[in-house]
Amino acid sequence: MAELVVDTDARDALVAHAREGAPEEVCGVLGGREGGDGGGRPGRVTRHERVPNVAETPETRYELDPEAQFAALRAIEDAGDDVVGFYHSHPAGPDDPSATDEAQATWPDAVYCIVSLAATEPRLGAWRWTGETFEELSVRVD
């Protein structure tokens, strides 16, 4: 299983964002360094950019605001970082992708992180979208 490394500060910031937004899902873009596997991902997450969730039912769905998403992508790249992928939260669900998450995934080879607040301690799951399905990544917080 491929590994995604997440800086401790980045993980803490993702969890804080999820808690602030609960009971609605929150979302954003992950920045850092792509891995060196030729496909570019997974890699290391060192930062995130929050993007407003504009879904009609944000308690159970997420949709990144297109203009804010573009601005987040640009901010990460302008800082000299790579766009590693995207994140969203599951305030009451598991840290694995839902059927809706799979149906809406659009960036092949991108990392999709999910912050789950369902358990006593928050969980961070990571997945790589192949273009057809999600492949689970191991997560190491460093």
Model-predicted regions and their roles:
Residues 1-84, 91-142:
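Conserved beta-strand-loop surface patch within small alpha/beta domains used
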